[in-house]
């Protein structure tokens, strides 16, 4: 089975997390799907770069590329962007990349999971302050955010080229401070 992703919980420090939370008010209950590049997005990307550099995962080639292929994505309640593509069954594939969940709270019953096809896991819950590295050529999609959700699914995503495949996170996660 293909390794779908590497997950790192509590990715950013509480100070940085609190700064993010103070900047996402407009996204929490929006009724439309959004992909935005704002000053908050730039700040979060800088923090992600810092953390990935500490973990020896950052690739210098991404510095100029990530601003072009990243955004804050907001998935409101009921939105189903994936299943409208019947040929792929609600999944798509990229050259690898990451998703960092910035919504303030999440309950598993709200859906919105990151889902995978033909991988070692079927889905990953969008837990707040969770960083997920999606390996290259892995079919993935987004589950529908259910009507019981009290806030939207909000994530910072990036899909740079030249990404690496990570088969195990054991050593990487264990070095995270």
State where each predicted segment sits.
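Non-heme Fe(II)/2-oxoglutarate
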Residues: 1-71
């Amino acid at each position: 089975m293909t390794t779908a992703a590497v997950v790192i919980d509590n990715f950013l420090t509480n100070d940085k997390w609190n700064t993010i939370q103070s900047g996402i008010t407009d996204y929490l209950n929006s009724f439309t799907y959004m992909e935005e590049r704002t000053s908050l997005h730039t700040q979060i990307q800088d923090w992600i770069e810092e953390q990935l550099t500490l973990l020896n995962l950052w690739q210098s080639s991404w510095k100029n590329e990530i601003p072009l292929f990243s955004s804050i994505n907001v998935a409101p309640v009921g939105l189903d962007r994936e299943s409208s593509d019947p040929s792929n069954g609600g999944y798509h594939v990229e050259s690898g990349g990451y998703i960092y969940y910035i919504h303030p709270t999440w309950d598993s019953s709200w859906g919105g999971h990151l889902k995978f096809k033909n991988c070692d896991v079927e889905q990953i819950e969008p837990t707040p302050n969770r960083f997920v590295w999606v390996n290259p050529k892995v079919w993935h999609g987004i589950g529908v955010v259910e009507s019981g959700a009290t806030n939207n699914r909000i994530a910072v995503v990036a899909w740079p080229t030249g990404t690496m495949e990570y088969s195990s996170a054991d050593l990487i996660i264990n070095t995270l401070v």
